[in-house]
Amino acid sequence: MDDKDIDKELRQKLNFSYCEETEIEGQKKVEESREASSQTPEKGEVQDSEAKGTPPWTPLSNVHELDTSSEKDKESPDQILRTPVSHPLKCPETPAQPDSRSKLLPSDSPSTPKTMLSRLVISPTGKLPSRGPKHLKLTPAPLKDEMTSLALVNINPFTPESYKKLFLQSGGKRKIRGDLEEAGPEEGKGGLPAKRCVLRETNMASRYEKEFLEVEKIGVGEFGTVYKCIKRLDGCVYAIKRSMKTFTELSNENSALHEVYAHAVLGHHPHVVRYYSSWAEDDHMIIQNEYCNGGSLQAAISENTKSGNHFEEPKLKDILLQISLGLNYIHNSSMVHLDIKPSNIFICHKMQSESSGVIEEVENEADWFLSANVMYKIGDLGHATSINKPKVEEGDSRFLANEILQEDYRHLPKADIFALGLTIAVAAGAESLPTNGAAWHHIRKGNFPDVPQELSESFSSLLKNMIQPDAEQRPSAAALARNTVLRPSLGKTEELQQQLNLEKFKTATLERELREAQQAQSPQGYTHHGDTGVSGTHTGSRSTKRLVGGKSARSSSFTSGEREPLH
C-alpha cells in the first residue's frame, strides 16, 4: 500500500473536517497552503517527494482510535506520541462539546506536526479544498449545536412573541429558546441551561473606571446605588446604577436583568428615563441611564415639607399630565410599572442656554411637552411586568392597590393609576401614607387623603376617581392624557374644531342650494353651433362653442341673438 492509500485511509477513519483548527493555527495553515499552491511544478514535486519520505504523524489521542499496525507506530517518533490530548476550542461563541466528539478532533497544541496538518488541509494536487457549499456539507452542524448556541443569548420576556419568532427563525428551522426548553430533557443535555441567564462579565479592566468619571453619589434604592458620572468620551453626564447584590446572592438571575429587559423594550420616550447601556462587572449589574438634573419628586416634596410649602394645583396638574403620558406609553407597550411613587419620578429642568427666546411651533399636539421648561419622567422599572403574562412583584405597600394584594391581575394598568393618584396626594401636601392597618384600608375604600390646600371640584373629583375601589372604573392613562381638566386648551381646541366642522357643513349646504337654483333659472335662448354656423337652438345649455378651422374650439358670446365677430 503506497502513501497515497495510507493518507486516504487515515482521512476516512479520522473523518476530519477541513476547517481550521483554531483561529491562529488556521490562519498559518491557509498562508502555507497558498504558498504551496503558488509554487512551480518542479518545487511542488520536490515538496511531494519530501512529504512521501515522512510518514503521517498522529497525536496520541488519535492513535488509540485507529487500529493501525505496529510498523506504522514504530515509524512515529516518541515525542509525537507524547503530544497532549486535544480539546475543543472554548470561546464565548462555542458551547462545550460532548466528550465523544472531542476524541475525533485533531490536536491544536503547538507540537502538532505540521506535515499532518498540511496533509489534512492540502489536497494531493497541492490546492486548497473548496470552501463552497459542497465543502460545508462535509461537516454538517447538528441540531444540538444549534440549540446550545441559543444558550448564549438572553430572550427578553417583554419582547412580543411575533418579534421573537421573527429574529430567531432561520429559514423556518430554528426554534426559539422557550420552545427548546419545552422540548424535553434529552435536548437539554447538549448544554442548554433550563432557565438560566447569560451574565458574562467584561474581559477588560473595570469599564466603569475606564469610561466614566464618578462625580458623586445621588441616591440609594432597593436595587442599588446610583452615581452621577461623566463619560470620558462624550463629556455628557449620566446616572450609573450599580446593583447592591451580587449575582451569586440573587435567588434568580432574571431579577438582575429585569430592569434591563424592560428598558430595552420600551425604547425612548420623553416621559420615561432613558436607558443607554448595561453590563456585568465585579459580579454586579451596572446600568447606564439618563441623568435628571432636578432629582426625584420625593426630594422636591421633602424640601417643600421643610419649608412648609407644597405644590400648587397648576403644578400638580402638570405632574399628573406628564406622568400619564409616560404611563400611556408603557401600557401601550403591553407593560405595567407597578411601583409608581414620588421616589420613582424624576425631574429634568431645561437649561437656560437651551431656551432661544423664540416661540416654538408644535406641529403635533402630542409634542407640546418639548417646549416645557420642566419635564417629569418615570424611572426604576425593577417591578415592571407584562400585562399578558404577568409575574407580579409587589411594590411599595403605601401606593399598592388592593386588587394587587388580592392577586387580581385583570386590570393591571389601573393599579398604576391608583398609585399615581396617591402620588399626587403626597405632592399636594398629604401626610405620610400608611403602610397597613385601618388607615390603609380606609384609603382603599375610595377616601382620598386629606391635603392642606383647597383643590378645585373638577380636579378633586378626578383624583378621587383615580383611587376608587373598582379598578375597572378608574380612568386609563390615555383618558387622563386627554382630560380637559388637565388640558383646558385641548377642550377649547376641540370646541373650535366642532364649530369649524359645523360651519363647513353649513357652507356645503348653501353651495348645493345655489347650484340647484342656478340650474332652475338657466336661460332658454342658447344656440347650438355646428361646422356650418348656427343650426338652431339648444334648450337648457349654458354655453355654446364654435369650431374654427374644423379643429379648434373657442367660446363665443351672443348679444341680442347676434354672433360677436372674432378678432
UniProtKB/Swiss-Prot annotation:
Localization (cell): Nucleus
Record field: catalytic activity: L-tyrosyl-[protein] + ATP = O-phospho-L-tyrosyl-[protein] + ADP + H(+)
Tissues where this protein is expressed: Expressed in oocytes (at protein level). May also be expressed in testis.
Any Pfam family hit: Pkinase
Region annotated Disordered, chain positions: 1-117, 514-567
InterPro entries: CC_SR_Kinase, Kinase-like_dom_sf, Prot_kinase_dom, Protein_kinase_ATP_BS, Ser/Thr_kinase_AS, Wee1-like_protein_kinase
Binding site for ATP: I218, G219, V220, G221, E222, F223, G224, T225, V226, K241
Binding residues for Mg(2+): N344, D380
Enzymatic class: transferase
Chief place where the protein resides: nucleus
Protein name stated in the entry: Wee1-like protein kinase 2
Organism: Homo sapiens (Human)
